C-alpha cells in the first residue's frame, strides 16, 4: 500500500477542513462564558469526543459511521441482562466485564447521536441503551457496591465511559439517571483519590481520574468538582527526578520503574489535551504555568520515539503482548503502529491548547507520519472514531509541508532508553538498572518479557528493500511485497512468535525461566547503577552493566552509535548457571514464509532487504526457523488464533559458564551486500582500543571519533578517566568537542584527560572546569546525578 496522501480537495472539503482546523486553534471564550457554563462545557466535550467539522456522507467518515451503526445493531441483538452480566460471556466478575458493558453501550450511544450510522435518533436503540444503563446501575455500578478485582476498571475504565454516555444522552436521561451516574463516580472516585499524589493516583492514572471527576462536575453542575479536577492536574506537570512522570530528559515513567512513554504516556497526553481544551476560557481554565512542560513534551519526549507512525515497543511496557484482544469488537491489533498512531492523535487534540508556532511544527511532523506510515495508513486507521479522523484529516489538508524524520541521537537516561536516527536507519535500545525494571508483567500480560531490558536493540532500515508486507489492522496478513522501507518488523506477529531467549542485541543465560519471573508490576530490577551514556546529539556512547534476571550472569555491554552503523562491544561475560550463554547479534522477523537470502562472507553476513553485520572474531551461528504462536500465549486477555512467522537468528555462543568472555560486532541496518563487504575488508575504519571489564573504547578515524565507556577509573587509548564515565570525542577540522557523562550517577566530581594537543577553549558548560590545555586537555566535571552530558569545545594545535 502506498503512502496515503490527501487528494485534491473540493471546495466543500476545504471549508470542512477549515472548520475542523479552527477547532484545533484557540477555543472561543465566548462559548464558555454563556449563561449556562455547564451546558457549554458539555457541548464542547461532545465536540471533542464525537467530532466536528466533517461531512458524514464523505469518506472515510461514511464507512466508519456505518460500521458504528452495524456494531450497535449487533450489540442490541445480543444484549441479555442477567444479575451477573449484560452480555453473555462477559460477566461482571472480573470487573473488566463492567467496563466492557459500558464500552458497548458507548458504541450504541455513538450510533444514536451521530449522523450517518443508520440508527441516528432510533427510539428503540435509545430504549435499549437506557435499559443497559439502568441494569448496570442497579446491579453493580452503584454506591452500594464494594470494589473487587482490578481497581482500574472501577476508577478509570468504567467511569470514563459512563461520563461520556451521560454527556451524550444528557437530554434523554432525566434527572434521576444523571444523579445516579454522578453518585457512582463520587463513590468509586472519591475526592480523596485526587488528594495525595501517590499510589495509583499519579502520572497518566491521575489524568484519567481527573477526566472523570471533571465530567462529573459538568454533568452534576458541581463547581467544586471542576475545581478539584483542575487543581489535581498540577502535580502531573512538573518534571520529576524519581518515580512516575515526565523527566527533564524526555523520559516518561509509570509504575515507578517502567519506561512507558508509548502507552501510559499517550494516555496522559491525550487526557491533558482533552481537559485543557474543555476548560479553556471557563472559570476553571488550567492556568498553571507548568502546563507548558506538557506542551514541550510533544517534541522532547514523544516525537523522538515515533518512527513512521509507530512508537517503539521499548516504551510500551507490558502492552507489547496484547495484539488482538478478545474484548475488542473492532479486532484491531494493538501493535507499535497502533500505539504510535494513538500518540499522533493525542498530539492533534493537544494542539487546541498550543501556540501557533507549536501547532505549526506539530502539524508538519504529523503530516510526515501520515505520509510515511504505509503499514496501517493513519487517515483510515481502524481504531480511530470520526472525531480523531476529522482532526487528522484537517491537519493533512491544511497548508504546509510534511516534516521528514530528523536525524540525531536521543538519550533518555532516566528510563534507560536510547534512540538513534540516521538517514539510513532508526534504532532503539532498551536497558535495565536499579532505577528501571528488566520488564513489566501483570494482569496476565507479558509474562515472558524477561530479557527485553537486557540490551535489546531494535532497528528499522529506511528505504531498504523489505520483502515483507505484514499488516496490522484487521487482517494481520503477511506476505512478500518487495516494498522498501516498511516499518512492520515488530508489528507483524513479532512478539507471539519470537524466541524470548533470543531477543535482538541481548546477552542472556539460556537458563529457563518461569512465567512472571522476578515478580509483577516492574518488580524485577538488577542491582546495578552504571547504565547510560553520553551524546553530542548526533553520535553516542551508551553502556550497560548487565546482571541477568534470575541468573548469575554479569556482563558489560557498550554501543557506539555512529553515522551508518552501531558498534557493539561486550566484555566480562561471566556466568555460573551451568547452561550456555549467548549474545544475540540479531533476530529478524522474515514474515510468513520469507525467502530473503542470507549471504555469508569473510567476517560478515548480509540479509536481503534488511542489512548486515560484521563479526571480526568468534563464530557467528545462524538459524532459520518457522515459529508459531498466539497472542494468548503471552496475554490472557488476547485472542487464541495462531500464526507462523519465519525467523533469521544470528548469535555468538559464549559456552557454558563463561568467564570474562567478550565480543565485537557491528550492525549496519539497510546496508547493501557490497557496502557491507567493503566495510568488513577495511581494516582501518575501526580500531577497538579496549574491551574488557574495566573499559570499552573505539576510534573511527574517518569520523574523527574516539569514544569510551569507563566502568571504573582507567585509560583507553588517548583517554583517561578518574572514575566511571562515558566519553565521546568528535574532531571536526581544527576543533574538537568532548562530551562527558557519569552513568553511575554518584554526583561526585571526576577528571578526564584527552592526550592530544589543544589550544584555546571555545566553550565549556558551567559544570566543566578546564584544568590544563597545551600538550593535552585536562578537565574536571561536576556531573550531577541524572547522567546528563557535559561538553567543552577546543581548538586543536
Model feature map: region roles:
Residues 13, 28-44:
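C-terminal segment of N-terminal export signals and the immediately downstream linker at the start
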Residues 76-323:
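Aromatic-lined, polymer-binding surfaces characteristic
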Residues 37-71:
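N-terminal mature-domain "stem" immediately C-terminal to a signal peptide or N-terminal signal-anchor/transmembrane
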Residues 1-9, 20:
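N-terminal secretory signal peptides
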Residues 22-26:
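Hydrophobic h-region of N-terminal signal peptides that target proteins for export
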Residues 766-770:
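Small-residue (G/S/T/A) turn/hinge positions that recur once per unit in extracellular repeat modules
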Residues 664, 777-797:
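C-terminal beta-strand-rich structural cap/linker in extracellular carbohydrate-active enzymes
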Residues 275-737, 741-749, 753-760:
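Extended polysaccharide-engagement surfaces of secreted carbohydrate-active enzymes
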Amino acid at each position: 500500500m502506498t503512502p496515503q496522501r490527501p487528494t485534491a480537495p473540493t471546495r466543500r472539503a476545504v471549508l470542512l477542513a477549515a472548520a475542523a482546523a479552527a477547532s484545533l486553534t484557540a477555543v472561543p471564550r465566548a462559548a464558555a462564558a454563556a449563561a449556562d457554563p455547564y451546558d457549554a462545557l458539555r457541548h464542547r466535550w461532545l465536540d471533542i469526543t464525537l467530532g466536528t467539522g466533517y461531512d458524514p456522507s464523505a469518506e472515510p467518515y461514511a464507512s466508519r459511521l456505518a460500521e458504528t451503526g452495524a456494531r450497535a445493531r449487533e450489540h442490541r441483538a445480543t444484549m441479555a441482562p442477567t444479575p451477573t452480566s449484560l452480555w453473555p460471556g462477559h460477566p461482571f466478575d472480573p470487573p473488566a466485564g463492567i467496563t466492557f458493558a459500558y464500552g458497548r453501550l458507548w458504541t450504541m450511544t455513538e450510533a444514536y447521536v451521530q449522523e450517518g450510522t443508520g440508527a441516528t435518533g432510533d427510539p428503540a436503540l435509545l430504549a435499549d441503551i437506557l435499559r443497559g444503563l439502568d441494569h448496570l446501575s442497579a446491579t453493580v455500578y452503584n454506591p452500594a457496591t464494594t470494589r473487587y478485582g482490578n481497581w482500574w476498571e472501577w476508577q478509570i475504565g468504567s467511569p470514563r465511559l459512563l461520563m461520556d454516555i451521560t454527556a451524550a444522552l444528557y437530554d434523554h436521561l432525566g434527572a434521576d439517571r444523571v444523579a445516579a451516574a454522578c453518585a457512582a463516580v463520587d463513590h468509586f472516585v472519591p475526592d480523596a483519590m485526587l488528594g495525595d499524589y501517590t499510589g495509583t493516583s499519579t502520572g497518566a492514572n491521575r489524568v484519567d481520574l481527573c477526566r472523570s471527576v471533571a465530567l462529573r462536575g459538568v454533568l452534576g453542575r458541581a463547581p467544586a468538582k471542576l475545581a478539584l479536577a483542575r487543581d489535581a492536574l498540577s502535580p502531573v506537570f512538573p518534571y520529576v527526578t524519581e518515580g512516575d512522570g515526565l523527566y527533564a530528559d524526555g523520559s516518561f515513567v509509570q509504575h515507578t520503574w517502567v519506561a512507558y512513554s508509548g502507552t501510559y504516556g499517550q494516555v496522559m497526553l491525550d487526557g491533558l489535551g482533552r481537559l485543557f481544551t474543555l476548560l479553556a476560557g471557563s472559570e476553571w481554565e488550567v492556568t498553571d504555568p507548568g502546563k507548558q512542560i506538557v506542551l514541550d513534551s510533544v517534541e522532547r519526549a514523544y516525537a523522538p520515539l515515533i518512527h513512521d507512525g509507530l512508537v517503539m515497543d521499548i516504551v510500551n511496557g507490558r502492552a507489547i503482548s496484547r495484539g488482538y484482544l478478545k474484548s475488542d469488537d473492532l479486532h484491531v491489533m494493538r501493535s507499535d503502529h497502533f500505539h504510535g498512531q494513538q500518540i499522533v492523535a493525542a498530539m492533534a487534540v493537544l494542539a487546541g491548547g498550543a501556540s501557533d508556532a507549536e501547532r505549526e511544527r506539530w502539524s508538519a511532523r504529523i503530516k510526515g507520519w501520515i505520509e510515511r506510515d504505509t503499514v496501517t495508513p493513519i487517515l483510515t486507521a481502524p481504531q480511530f472514531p470520526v472525531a480523531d479522523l476529522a482532526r487528522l484529516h484537517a491537519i493533512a489538508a491544511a497548508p504546509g509541508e510534511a516534516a521528514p524524520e530528523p536525524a540525531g541521537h536521543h538519550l533518555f537516561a532516566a528510563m534507560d532508553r536510547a534512540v538513534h536516527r540516521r538517514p539510513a536507519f532508526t534504532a532503539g535500545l532498551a536497558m535495565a538498572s536499579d532505577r528501571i525494571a528488566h520488564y513489566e508483567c501483570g494482569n496476565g500480560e507479558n509474562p515472558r518479557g524477561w530479557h527485553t531490558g537486557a540490551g535489546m536493540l531494535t532497528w528499522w532500515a529506511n528505504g531498504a528493500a523489505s520483502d515483507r508486507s505484514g499488516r496490522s489492522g484487521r487482517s494481520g496478513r503477511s506476505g512478500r511485497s518487495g516494498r522498501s522501507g516498511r516499518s512492520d518488523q515488530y508489528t507483524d506477529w513479532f512478539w507471539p512468535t519470537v524466541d524470548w531467549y533470543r531477543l535482538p542485541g541481548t546477552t542472556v543465560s539460556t537458563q529457563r525461566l518461569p512465567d512472571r519471573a522476578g515478580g509483577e508490576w516492574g518488580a524485577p530490577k538488577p542491582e546495578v547503577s552504571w547504565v547510560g551514556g553520553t551524546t553530542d546529539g548526533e553520535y553516542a556512547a551508551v553502556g550497560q552493566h548487565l546482571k541477568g534476571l534470575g541468573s548469575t550472569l554479569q556482563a558489560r555491554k557498550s554501543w557506539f552509535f555512529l553515522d551508518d552503523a552501531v558498534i557493539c562491544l561486550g566484555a566480562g561475560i561471566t556466568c555460573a548457571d551451568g547452561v550456555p550463554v549467548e549474545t544475540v547479534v540479531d533476530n529478524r522477523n522474515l514474515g510468513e514464509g520469507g525467502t530473503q537470502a542470507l549471504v555469508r562472507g569473510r567476517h560478515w553476513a548480509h540479509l536481503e532487504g534488511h542489512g548486515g553485520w560484521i563479526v571480526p572474531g568468534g563464530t557467528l551461528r545462524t538459524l532459520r526457523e518457522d515459529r508459531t504462536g498466539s497472542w494468548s500465549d503471552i496475554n490472557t486477555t488476547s485472542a487464541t488464533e495462531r500464526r507462523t512467522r519465519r525467523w533469521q537468528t544470528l548469535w555468538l555462543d559464549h559456552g557454558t559458564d563463561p568467564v570474562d568472555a567478550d565480543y565485537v560486532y557491528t550492525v549496519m541496518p539497510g546496508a547493501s551486500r557490497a557496502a557491507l563487504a567493503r566495510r568488513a575488508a577495511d581494516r582501518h575504519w575501526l580500531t577497538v582500543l579496549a574491551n574488557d571489564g574495566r573499559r570499552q573504547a573505539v576510534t573511527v578515524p574517518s569520523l574523527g571519533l574516539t569514544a569510551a565507556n569507563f566502568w571504573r577509573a582507567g585509560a583507553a587509548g588517548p583517554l583517561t578517566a578518574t572514575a566511571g564515565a562515558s566519553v565521546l570525542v568528535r574532531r571536526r577540522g581544527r576543533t574538537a568537542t568532548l562530551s562527558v557523562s557519569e552513568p553511575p550517577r554518584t554526583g561526585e566530581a571526576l577528571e578526564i584527560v584527552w592526550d592530544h594537543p589543544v589550544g584555546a577553549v571555545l566553550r565549556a558548560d558551567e559544570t566543566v572546569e578546564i584544568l590544563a590545555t597545551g600538550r593535552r586537555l585536562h578537565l574536571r566535571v561536576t556531573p550531577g546525578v541524572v547522567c546528563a552530558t557535559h561538553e567543552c569545545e577546543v581548538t586543536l594545535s
